[in-house]
Design a protein with these regions (language model features):
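Residues that define the transmembrane beta-barrel architecture of outer-membrane proteins
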Residues: 52, 81-85, 138-142, 163, ...
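Repeated loop/turn-to-beta-strand initiation elements of outer-membrane beta-barrel proteins
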Residues: 65-66, 98-101, 153-155, 240-243, ...
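Extracellular loop and loop/strand-boundary signature of outer-membrane beta-barrel proteins
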Residues: 43-44, 72-81, 127-135, 154-155, ...
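Gram-negative (and chloroplast) outer-membrane scaffold detector with strong preference
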Residues: 99, 105-195
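Outer-membrane beta-barrel biogenesis signature
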Residues: 21-55, 155-162, 311, 327-331, ...
C-alpha cells in the first residue's frame, strides 16, 4: 500500500510540474503569435475546436490484487499466477495540446489463495498458510479519468507523435462481491454442507463478526469508490488508429475486497454454521479453492492448539491466534493497510470524430 501511495503522489507531482512547464514555454515567434490572433475563436487560443477530436477504444486487461491474502506484505509479492483476462470499453475526447479525458467501463476478476501463494517453510508467509483463506471477486468498474500527455501536440490528430507517454488520475465506482468455496463440513461442529464446493458470497456471512453488533465494524458495501491513477504509452499505428499499453492502480477506501481485514472473533457468536466455517478455515484438511491436501506436520511445528469456551457455551479448539478473540496475536488480516487492485491493459482505439471543415458558399 505504501508503494501505491508513493506512485499516487508522484502522479500528482508530474501533473503539476508538466502543466507548469508547458505554461512557461515561450512562443515560437511573433509571426506565429500574430497568426493565432487572427484565428481567435474563444478563450482556448492554443487548441481551437478544429484540432479537437473524440476516440473510442476496447482493451484486453488483467486485474491483479495486493492485500491481506498476498504472499507477503509488499506489493512486489503480488501473485501473477492469479491474473485473469478481462476487458475495458472506453470513450474520450482530446481538448488540449496535451490533455484529454476518458470515461471507461472495466470488468475483471481478482483472486487470492493462502494455500497456493503462502510458503509454509517461509518464516514470513507460514502464518498465511495456516490461515488457509481464499477468495474470488468479480469487479465491475466505471471510471472517469483526466490524462496528461508528456509530449505536447498543438496540431491536429494527423500530426500527433508516433509515441506518446502519459499519466492519469480520476475517480471511479466499482461493484464487487468476494466469494469462497464451501467446505465439506464445519470442523468445529461436524455440520455437513449440502452445497460443498460451491462459490458463495462472503459479505452476507459477516465472517469477522459484522452481523453480531459486538465488534467495531459494520457490513461493508458492495459498491465502493476508488481513485484510479497510473501511466501508459500510446503508439500511433495509422491516421485514425492507436494502440496503448497502460497500468493503473486503484486506491481504495476500505479493506474488504478480499473479505479479510481485522481479527478473528469468538466462534460461539455465529448462529450460521456457514459463517463460522468461513471465518476460521485453519483446521480444514484441504487447502485453497482447489481443495488440495494440507501438510499438518509443518503446521504443528509452527504453532499449537488452544481450547476455549465460546459465547454459546460450547468448546472450540483453534490454533493459537486463530479463532479466539481472547488471544493477543489474534490477527486475521491487517486493518492498517487497505487493499488495492491493479489493471494492466492493452488498448486499441480509433479516432471517431475528427474535425472536418465545411465549404462555405459566397
Amino acid at each position: 500500500m505504501r508503494f501505491g501511495l508513493g506512485l499516487f503522489a508522484i502522479s500528482i507531482l508530474l501533473i503539476l510540474f508538466s502543466t507548469d512547464l508547458i505554461a512557461q514555454m515561450p512562443g515560437r515567434s511573433i509571426k506565429n503569435n500574430s497568426h493565432r490572433l487572427t484565428r481567435f475563436r474563444g478563450p482556448n487560443l492554443k487548441f481551437p475546436e478544429y484540432k479537437r477530436y473524440s476516440f473510442a477504444g476496447v482493451s484486453i486487461n488483467s486485474m491483479n490484487y495486493f492485500g491481506d491474502l498476498s504472499p507477503a506484505s509488499n506489493i512486489s509479492s503480488t501473485d501473477l499466477n492469479y491474473s485473469r483476462p478481462g476487458f475495458t470499453l472506453s470513450y474520450g475526447r482530446k481538448y488540449g495540446p496535451n490533455y484529454w479525458w476518458r470515461i471507461s467501463y472495466s470488468w475483471g476478476t481478482l483472486r487470492g489463495d493462502d494455500f497456493d501463494s503462502a510458503d509454509p517453510n517461509n518464516e514470513v508467509a507460514q502464518y498465511r498458510y495456516i490461515r488457509n483463506l481464499h477468495f474470488r471477486n468479480r469487479i465491475s468498474e466505471l471510471a472517469f479519468t483526466f490524462h496528461l500527455d508528456l509530449l505536447e501536440n498543438p496540431y491536429t490528430y494527423l500530426r500527433r507523435p508516433g509515441w506518446t507517454p502519459y499519466i492519469f488520475l480520476g475517480v471511479a465506482l466499482f461493484h464487487h462481491n468476494p466469494k469462497a468455496r464451501v467446505p465439506e463440513s464445519d470442523v468445529q461442529t461436524g455440520y455437513q454442507f449440502e452445497n460443498a464446493g460451491e462459490w458463495v458470497s462472503l459479505q452476507p456471512l459477516g465472517t469477522e463478526g459484522q452481523n453480531t453488533g459486538l465488534y467495531n465494524n459494520k457490513p461493508y458495501r458492495r459498491i465502493q469508490p476508488a481513485i484510479p491513477f497510473g501511466l501508459g504509452v500510446t503508439k500511433r499505428i495509422a491516421d485514425q488508429w492507436d494502440i496503448s499499453l497502460e497500468i493503473g492502480l486503484r486506491y481504495l477506501f476500505f479493506d474488504y475486497i478480499d473479505d479479510v481485514s481485522g481479527g478473528y472473533v469468538d466462534l460461539g457468536l455465529f448462529d450460521d454454521p456457514m459463517a463460522r466455517a468461513m471465518s476460521d478455515r485453519s483446521q480444514e484438511i484441504t487447502g485453497g479453492a482447489r481443495a488440495k491436501p494440507r501438510d499438518f506436520t509443518i503446521i504443528e511445528g509452527i504453532t499449537s492448539k488452544h481450547t476455549y469456551v465460546g459465547a454459546d457455551g460450547r468448546s472450540y479448539t483453534v490454533y493459537h491466534g486463530y479463532g479466539s478473540d481472547l488471544h493477543s496475536s489474534n490477527i486475521r488480516g491487517n486493518i492498517n493497510d487497505r487493499d488495492i487492485y491493479i489493471i494492466t491493459s492493452l488498448k486499441l482505439s480509433r479516432i471517431v470524430k475528427p474535425y472536418q471543415k465545411t465549404r462555405r458558399f459566397r
